[in-house]
UniProtKB/Swiss-Prot annotation:
Disruption phenotype: Knockout male mice are completely infertile, whereas no reproductive defects are observed in females. Spermatozoa are completely absent from caudal epididymis, which only contains round cells likely corresponding to round spermatids and multinucleated cells. Seminiferous tubules contain germ cells up to the early round-spermatid stage but condensed and elongated spermatids and mature spermatozoa are completely absent. Round spermatids do not contain an acrosomal vesicle.
Pfam families in the cross-refs: Kazal_1
Molecular function terms, GO-annotated: serine-type endopeptidase inhibitor activity
Listed name of the protein: Serine protease inhibitor Kazal-type 2
Lineage top rank: taxon: Eukaryota
Tissue spec: Expressed in sperm (at protein level). Expressed in testis but not in ovary, brain, heart, kidney or lung. Within testis, expressed in epididymis and germ cells.
GO process terms (BP): acrosome assembly; apoptotic process; fertilization; male germ cell proliferation; male gonad development; positive regulation of apoptotic process; seminiferous tubule development; spermatid development
Subcellular location, record wording: Secreted; Cytoplasmic vesicle, Secretory vesicle, Acrosome
Alphabetical list of SUPFAM superfamilies matching this protein: Kazal-type serine protease inhibitors
InterPro entries attached to this UniProt entry: Kazal_dom, Kazal_dom_sf, SPINK2
């Protein structure tokens, strides 16, 4: 019985270690996201140009300024995944 418990613990540890490794690779990918440059926009209005960006919250914003407005309103931390719709 003790051997079975030890075997289950070792198996569980190995599985959690693999999960940790895969989440580490996700963190590396996240560090490659672009931080929006919110300092050069005149709030509360944004230009109406359509230049979509995909945020790390998986929402598409019509341009970088609208993403910055969302960050300003919510205080959330959203980076840009890509310069196109999600």
């Amino acid at each position: 019985m003790l051997r079975l418990v030890l075997l289950l613990l070792v198996t569980d540890f190995a599985a959690s270690h693999e999960t940790l490794d895969s989440s580490d690779s996700q963190i590396m990918k996240r560090s490659q996201f672009r931080t929006p440059d919110c300092g050069h926009f005149d709030f509360p209005a944004c230009p109406r140009n359509l230049n979509p960006v995909c945020g790390t919250d998986m929402n598409t914003y019509s341009n970088e300024c609208t993403l910055c407005m969302k960050i300003r309103e919510d205080g959330s931390h959203i980076n840009i995944i890509k310069d196109e719709p999600c």
